[in-house]
Each structure stands twice: as C-alpha cells, then as structure tokens.
Amino acid sequence: MSAGKIVQIIGAVIDVEFPQDAVPKVYDALKVESGLTLEVQQQLGGGVVRCIALGTSDGLKRGLKVENTNNPIQVPVGTKTLGRIMNVLGEPIDEQGAIGEEERWAIHRSAPSYEEQSNSTELLETGIKVIDLICPFAKGGKVGLFGGAGVGKTVNMMELIRNIAIEHSGYSVFAGVGERTREGNDFYHEMKDSNVLDKVSLVYGQMNEPPGNRLRVALTGLTMAEKFRDEGRDVLFFVDNIYRYTLAGTEVSALLGRMPSAVGYQPTLAEEMGVLQERITSTKTGSITSVQAVYVPADDLTDPSPATTFAHLDSTVVLSRQIASLGIYPAVDPLDSTSRQLDPLVVGQEHYDVARGVQGILQRYKELKDIIAILGMDELSEEDKLVVARARKIERFLSQPFFVAEVFTGSPGKYVTLKDTIRGFKGILEGEYDHIPEQAFYMVGSIDEVLEKAKNM
C-alpha cells in the first residue's frame, strides 16, 4: 500500500499528495491515519489527487498520512446484511455487533450487458387499490413516488415493504439517502414491529452526514440488492429519497470546482442519475424492482432533478396535496399517475377498461366542479348528477387503511387483491352500488366491506 499526505482541506474535499509513481486511480478508497475513508474523484497532476471525505473532516490537518487501499469502497453483501443497519461503508451502526460477512463487493460496478437483461411484463401485486388499478408495478420495473413535503411518500414506501415482505416473502434493501434520522429510526422500529426486519437490509446516509456519504449510500444499497438478484431472487430496492442523491451530487460538484448548469445543478446530473438507474435492472437470473421516493422541490415537476428521474421510470405514482387535504390517503392522484404496464396486452382487457373508466369519470367530475361551484348541483343534467355521485364514490373508494398507519387512522390495515380491486371499481362504474351512501366507501378495503359498512349506517 502506497502512502501519501494531506496537502489541502476544503470542507468535505481533501487533496492528497502521493509519489509520482504511485498515484491512486479514480474511485480508489484511501484511509487516513485518523480512520476516515476518502474516495478519489480527480487526479490534479503532480501526484496530487482530489478526494471526497466519506465522514466528517473535523480534526483533520495537513501532513496527516494517507494510505491507498488500491481498491474501490467494498461493502459486505449477502444474507448476513438482513436485519442490520449499515452506513455507506457497510459498517454496522445498530450496535448489534459485527456483520459476519460472506463476501465483499465494490460499490462501483458496471450495469448488466444487453444480452444479460430480461424484459418481463409480470405484474407485482402491491395490495394497494389505487396503485394496482391505475399504475400497476412491473416485476423488475422502476417506480417513482413523486410528491412535495408531507404528502406521504415515506408511509407509502413502508406499506409497500410490509406488503411485499408478508404477502410475497421477498427480500428488500432500503437505502435512506439524506433523509431525517428520526424517519430512519421510526422505519427500523416499524419493520421490527411488523416482523419483517429479517427480510430487509437497511443502509443509511442521513441528512446531517457529509455530501460524500449521501452521494454514495445509494450505490452501497444497490450493490447489496445486486447480490441478492445474482443469487436468483426477486428483490425490492427502496430509495428514500432520490432527490437528496442529486442534491449531494450538486454539493460535491460545487466543491470539486465544476461549473454549475441549469438551476445550479451539477453539469453531470443526467450521467450520475444514469449510473445509478442503469444498474437497477432485471437479468435472466433475478430481478430488482425499485421504488424511489422523489421529493419535488416547490411542487414543480419540471425542475431538472425530478425531470431527469422521470426518464428512467416505468410507473409514476404522483401524490397530490389537494387529495391529501380532502383526507383521502394514500393521496395518489389517479389522473396524474401513469404506468407503462397499463396496456390491455399486459394487464388484460377488463383491468384496462375499468382503469380507463375510473379515470374518465374522475376527469369528467373535475370538469364539472367549476359549474357546481358557480351554479350548484341542481343545474346539472341527470346524467351529470350520476357521474358526480359515482365519481365521489370512486374518490373515496380509492382510499385505504394502511397497516403501517394504524396508529394514525385507528382502523386495521387492509391488503386488497387485484381481483377484488377490479371487481369493486367495475361495480361502481356499472351502477351496482348507486343506492349506497358515499361515506360507506371511505377508508375500507374491498367492496364487501363497503356493503357491510352500509348496513350499519
């Protein structure tokens, strides 16, 4: 191992000088004698490399000895990581002792080649009505949960992990990228209480950590997911929040002295996003289905960060503040959310017709709202009155009590099969439940519960 010394420290960016014949490669991990790990980002010439610190640079000083490990950052992978919380370097931070690692993989890997990739159109049932109906997930697809602050991205994600672990008994990897430590803690205890902790690996790089950690923690989680996939499993990979990954890239880019591009983002925004997203894919051995929470700055979907993310996704689940303000949770906007799987050749004609019928009625209701606001319901034709009545039932029937939100709602969570979901909405569209009051449709699971609830009203 060749040794160098620190020559300059600017916040999280550290310049290290090595002998001319032993300059580290880009992405090599370096170890400072204080125990801090650095990752080489640029070679400046004259034996000097510019690195990003994967940890706080407090207490560092010029002249400290730095050793080159001659390898990129390597993290433990395999079943020993399940039920554990790790940091960006794969070190345990849950005070449960060392991780008995089976093997270590480098976090920088190339994406699978074209011939290794598989294209599956198999659906992944989530048990959440609005998602299964309007924006179904593909096994091995990429899903984005879009929403501003406080509309329920993390709760939706927790419900998905719980449903996949319990109903499909699959493994999940959760990468907490630049989110609140409190959320990470809640998440851990929620998984523990739901008895699914032994099926989830948790990798955290929280808000208060340096930008290097937040930039690399998604790759650490992805590497663990790739290991499960290459063992022939169908694995779920959750990222909360992909926007913070971009933001960390912006911070690092500015510190490295690159010129900013639109809205101050890094010039390499599309490439950095591609490096992560291209590795999240299904091969002939197994699949990675990824669910990514995407914070939308100022609710503006045209911001370069969410806009770049859109290009990679198969399904987009858009959470809306208007729907949340009506008290309808999950606050998924059925008119804004899309899925490439919603195609009669993939989901079947019946599912497609019901989903489009639901969207059609909700769209018509949206148009009629202005007329109702000005002239009142009485001015509508009988046909339009029926549309409004059915739309309001559909709106309420799209809500659902979550298992992970039982504390807030006070009602037990419900998992609804796709068959029951289609049956329920088809019945509403065909007018079978026109006689039932709309309150009966609010916060229930299947249509049978609606009928049960209506009897007691």
Swiss-Prot record:
Record key words, sorted: ATP synthesis, ATP-binding, Cell inner membrane, Cell membrane, CF(1), Hydrogen ion transport, Ion transport, Membrane, Nucleotide-binding, Translocase, Transport
Signal peptide start-end: none
EC number: 7.1.2.2
Membrane topology: Peripheral membrane protein
Any one GO molecular-function label of the UniProt entry: ATP hydrolysis activity
Localization, UniProt: Cell inner membrane
Record field: catalytic activity: ATP + H2O + 4 H(+)(in) = ADP + phosphate + 5 H(+)(out)
Protein residues bound to ATP: 147-154
Keyword ATP-binding among record annotations: yes
One Gene Ontology cellular component: plasma membrane
Primary subcellular site in the record, as a coarse category: membrane
InterPro entries on file: AAA+_ATPase, ATP-synt_VA_C, ATP_synth_F1_bsu, ATPase_a/bsu_AS, ATPase_alpha/beta_chains, ATPase_F1/V1/A1_a/bsu_N, ATPase_F1/V1/A1_a/bsu_N_sf, ATPase_F1/V1/A1_a/bsu_nucl-bd
SUPFAM superfamilies in UniProt: C-terminal domain of alpha and beta subunits of F1 ATP synthase, N-terminal domain of alpha and beta subunits of F1 ATP synthase, P-loop containing nucleoside triphosphate hydrolases
Similarity annotation: Belongs to the ATPase alpha/beta chains family.
NCBIfam families named among the record's database cross-references: atpD (TIGR01039)
Quaternary structure, from the entry: F-type ATPases have 2 components, CF(1) - the catalytic core - and CF(0) - the membrane proton channel. CF(1) has five subunits: alpha(3), beta(3), gamma(1), delta(1), epsilon(1). CF(0) has three main subunits: a(1), b(2) and c(9-12). The alpha and beta chains form an alternating ring which encloses part of the gamma chain. CF(1) is attached to CF(0) by a central stalk formed by the gamma and epsilon chains, while a peripheral stalk is formed by the delta and b chains.
Function (record text): Produces ATP from ADP in the presence of a proton gradient across the membrane. The catalytic sites are hosted primarily by the beta subunits.
Protein name (record): ATP synthase subunit beta
Record organism: Haemophilus influenzae (strain PittEE)
